[in-house]
């Protein structure tokens, strides 16, 4: 898990605006999120993990255990159920909320991170590419 402790910064994205539209966000919010250049870092502490992300909303740290669902709050304060599963260099985050189920599959490969985003209420696929 050589990716632990590295800070990954967004370098490009594909179809992220389509995913945001499917989630019902306003055009202004979509533009702000698409223009943002977030970072993220994952760390381990025993059998727990934390992901710290920085971006348009400031800094946010989420702590979790692999495979354990928990109550979470995202975006504009929406309460959801989240579950992260860590499997080697792949971290899958499933979010269940009123707007459906979204899956964020994070694949780490050295200094590269590709996040593939799908949703139960959208036929598209979005990708966000990060570099450490």
Swiss-Prot record:
Source domain of life: Eukaryota
Keywords assigned by UniProt, alphabetized: Acetylation, Cytoplasm, Lipid-binding, Transport
Distribution of this protein across tissues and organs: Midgut.
InterPro entries linked: Calycin (IPR012674), Fatty_acid-bd (IPR000463), ILBP (IPR031259), Lipocln_cytosolic_FA-bd_dom (IPR000566)
One GO CC annotation: cytoplasm
A GO molecular-function descriptor: lipid binding
Residues bearing the modification N-acetylserine: 2
Keyword Nucleus: no
Cell location: Cytoplasm
Chain residues that bind hexadecanoate: 40, 128-130
Subunit structure: Monomer.
Function: Binds fatty acids in a 1:1 molar ratio.
Description of its domains: Forms a beta-barrel structure that accommodates hydrophobic ligands in its interior.
Family to which this protein belongs: Belongs to the calycin superfamily. Fatty-acid binding protein (FABP) family.
PANTHER family: FATTY ACID BINDING PROTEIN (PTHR11955)
UniProt name for this protein: Fatty acid-binding protein 2
Protein source organism: Manduca sexta
Gene name linked to the record: MFB2
């Amino acid at each position: 898990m050589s990716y632990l402790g590295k800070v990954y910064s967004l370098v490009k994205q594909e179809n992220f605006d389509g995913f945001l539209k499917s989630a019902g966000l306003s055009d202004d919010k979509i533009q702000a999120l698409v223009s943002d250049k977030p970072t993220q870092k994952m760390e381990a502490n025993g059998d727990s993990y934390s992901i710290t992300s920085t971006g348009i909303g400031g800094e946010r740290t989420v702590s979790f255990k692999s495979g354990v669902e928990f109550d979470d709050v995202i975006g504009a304060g929406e309460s959801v159920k989240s579950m992260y599963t860590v499997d080697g260099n792949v971290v899958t985050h499933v979010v269940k909320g009123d707007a459906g189920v979204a899956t964020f599959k994070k694949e780490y490969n050295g200094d590269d991170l590709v996040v593939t985003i799908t949703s139960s209420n959208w036929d598209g696929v979005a990708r966000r590419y990060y570099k450490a």
